[in-house]
C-alpha cells in the first residue's frame, strides 16, 4: 500500500468529518451523519454547513491525519468545497506521503499523534489477511479514522481484495443481508449488542479489537452461527501486536514482532526501520512468541472500546465549583462497564438531590459518553479503607 484511492479517502472523510465538526463545534448544533455524506456533498451546504472557522479547523485536522504537509498541497484544502473533489485531492497527494497520523482516543489527556507508515500498515494488513483467509466482503462496523478501523476497514479489505460495507450500513448488512463468508470487524461493545440481540449468523468470521471479549459473549456468538472470532491485541502507538482465536489461548505475536519480558519490538518496514514499544499492560510471556496480558500498568480502563482514565474524569468533576473532592471508579464488567463517582460537595449545606441534578446536567453537556458516570453518590468525605486508600 502506497497511498489511497479516492473511494478509500471518501470512506475516511465520512468517518472523519462528523467527529471533527463535533469537536470543533462543541454543543453548537449536531454534526452530519456519515450516511448523509457523499461525493457531491458540499462543506458550505446542508447537511455539513461549515462556516469559515469550521472549514479552517477541518482543514487542519485533515492535513494532520493525511500528512499533506509532506506534499505542499495542504493550503488547497481551504479552497475546496465539494467532498468528492477533496477526496481526489487527498488521494493524489497520498501517493507522495509517508503514511497516516492516528491519534490516541479517550480521557488520557491531549490526544497523542502516532505516525504509521504505508509500509507498516501494509505489513499488518497482509499478516491479518494471511491469518483470516479469503473473504469476499468485509463488514467494517467501526470508525475507520481510528487505527484499528483503518486497518480492518481499509487496509485489510485491500489486502484481501474484498468489497467493504461501511460502518453506517453495517447493521442493515448484518441483520437483513448476511452472507456465510462475511468478515465482520467491530469492537466488543457491538459484539455484545449482537449477542444480547440474539442475532443469528449464517456463518462468517469475526475480528475484534480494543479490549478482550467476555468469554460468555464470545461463546454465545459462536453458538449463534459465527464460524470463528479473532481477537487482536495492540495499541494506537504500535498497531496490532498479537492474535488469538479463543480466550483460553494466549496471544501469539504477528510475524514481524519480537518480544521479551520488558518490551516488544519489531522491524516494521521492509527498509529495516525498527520500533520499540514499552507495553501498556503487564505481559506474562510463555516464550518469545506467546504472551498473555494480566492488567494495565496505569489506571486506564476500557469503556465502549475507548481508553478512559478514572483519575482524569475525577479531575474534570473537581473543576466544577460545587465539587470539593471526587473519586471515580468503574462498575460492571466487559462491554457493560461504566463509571461511578463519589462527590464531596464544596458547601456543607448543599442539598444532595439538587447537587446531583446539577452535576448530571453538567456531565451530559461537558463529558463524552464513555466518561460520564452513570451513578453519582454524595457524601461528606471520600470513602477510604483501613489503609487510607480510596475505595
UniProtKB/Swiss-Prot annotation:
InterPro entries in the cross-refs: 4_coum_CoA_lig, AMP-bd_C, AMP-bd_C_sf, AMP-dep_synth/lig_dom, ANL_N_sf, ATP-dep_AMP-bd_enzyme
UniProt keyword terms in alphabetical order: ATP-binding, Ligase, Nucleotide-binding, Phenylpropanoid metabolism
Single annotated GO MF: 4-coumarate-CoA ligase activity
Any single GO BP term: phenylpropanoid metabolic process
Gene3D superfamilies (UniProt xref): 3.30.300.30, N-terminal domain of ligase-like
SUPFAM superfamilies reported for this sequence: Acetyl-CoA synthetase-like
This enzyme's EC code(s): 6.2.1.12
Catalytic activity, as annotated: (E)-4-coumarate + ATP + CoA = (E)-4-coumaroyl-CoA + AMP + diphosphate
Keyword Nucleotide-binding: yes
Family recorded in the similarity comment: Belongs to the ATP-dependent AMP-binding enzyme family.
Free-text function comment from the UniProt entry: Converts p-coumaric acid into p-coumaryl CoA. This is necessary for the activation of the photoactive yellow protein (PYP) chromophore.
The protein's name in its UniProt record: 4-coumarate--CoA ligase
Biological source species: Halorhodospira halophila (Ectothiorhodospira halophila)
